[in-house]
Amino acid sequence: FSSITSYFGSTLGSIGVMIIFGAVIAAGISDTGAATSMVNFFIRLFKGKRLELAPALTGFIMSIPVFGDIAIILNAPISAILAKRKKMSMTQVAPFVNLGLTLTHGLVPPTPGILAVSVLLGADIGTVILWGLVCSVISFAVCYFVLTPIYSKCEYIEPLASYTEGIEAVEDTSSVDALLIKEENTPKAAASFLPLLLPAVMIAVGSIGK
């Protein structure tokens, strides 16, 4: 029993700061509209095509320092709005959003779960981050290209009405600006991505430095 409590105490001490840090980041994303900025960045990047990738990749990055269940809550309204805008079934959007945030939540520190496992096993955190990202990217890409044709043929599921009230479908889906989520006083994309990626980058660089 003493061994268990000893390991628990040391592990909790190691990851406690990251848990608090993740909660602060999540609150900041919610209050500033950073999630909207990130989604709009990906909409522009893909020129309005493969719209499901915008919230999916946002969740992928968001779940590196933030708990996956919180990332789901932050991404759900955005996913519903985009689905309504382009008349897409939620079966084409929700699975990939969940896939993206689940992969990094489970495989890439400093998310507390994988961070705790890494500490207990004495693994190099920088190496875990590197291989976690490699595995996550490959897994997401394979699943996306394999499952997209399947989900596109599934039963049409409407986005949740409470998220899409007042949202109209876009007639000209080739117009990128028409697909963007309009929200005032949102931070720039770079400022939105920075607090999510910086912890992992700093930990990885610190590990390489050792």
Residue ranges with predicted function:
Residues 1-85:
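Membrane-embedded alpha-helical segments and adjacent helix-loop junctions characteristic
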Residues 4-13, 122-134, 185-191, 210:
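Interfacial loop-to-helix junctions that mark the boundaries of transmembrane helices
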Residues 28-36, 45, 49, 86, ...:
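Membrane-interface elements of multi-pass transporters and channels
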Residues 73-89, 114-128:
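Membrane-interfacial helix-loop connectors
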Residues 110-130, 134, 155, 160-163:
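Transmembrane alpha-helical segments and their short flanking loops
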